[in-house]
Amino acid sequence: MSLIYMNVMMAFTMSLTGLLMYRSHLMSALLCMEGMMLSLFILAALTILNSHFTLANMAPIILLVFAACEAAIGLALLVMISNTYGTDYVQNLNLLQC
């Protein structure tokens, strides 16, 4: 396994560890999820470039689109929670149930 793949996998692992450890604020959870999606995008792009599989060239772009949608929904939820409750604690998400 090359050094680049190990660095990307380590970045994903560190983002996942950050997501599991810092669960109190929504902003830190969103940043950790963005780090995970970015490392997945880089890993998918490197894998497709190294395997010369031309039919799957759109897969990293589709992953990037899903990451952008996830970020937009997360930021909208963050703005709604911070305007309603004044804080961005994850525990306030339980209060949003209908």
Curated annotation (Swiss-Prot):
Disulfide bonds: none annotated. Keywords: Electron transport, Membrane, Mitochondrion, Mitochondrion inner membrane, NAD, Respiratory chain, Translocase, Transmembrane, Transmembrane helix, Transport, Ubiquinone. It is found in: Mitochondrion inner membrane. It comes from the Eukaryota. InterPro entries: NADH_UbQ_OxRdtase_chain4L/K, NUOK/Mnh_C1-like. Its EC number is 7.1.1.2. The keyword Kinase does not apply. It catalyses: a ubiquinone + NADH + 5 H(+)(in) = a ubiquinol + NAD(+) + 4 H(+)(out). GO terms for molecular function: NADH dehydrogenase (ubiquinone) activity. The chain crosses the membrane at residues 1-21, 29-49, 61-81. It holds the Pfam family Oxidored_q2. It is a multi-pass membrane protein. One of its GO terms (biological process) is ATP synthesis coupled electron transport. GO terms for cellular component: mitochondrial inner membrane; respiratory chain complex I. Belongs to the complex I subunit 4L family. PANTHER family: NADH-UBIQUINONE OXIDOREDUCTASE CHAIN 4L, NADH-UBIQUINONE OXIDOREDUCTASE SUBUNIT ND4L. Core subunit of respiratory chain NADH dehydrogenase (Complex I) which is composed of 45 different subunits. Core subunit of the mitochondrial membrane respiratory chain NADH dehydrogenase (Complex I) which catalyzes electron transfer from NADH through the respiratory chain, using ubiquinone as an electron acceptor. Part of the enzyme membrane arm which is embedded in the lipid bilayer and involved in proton translocation. This is NADH-ubiquinone oxidoreductase chain 4L.
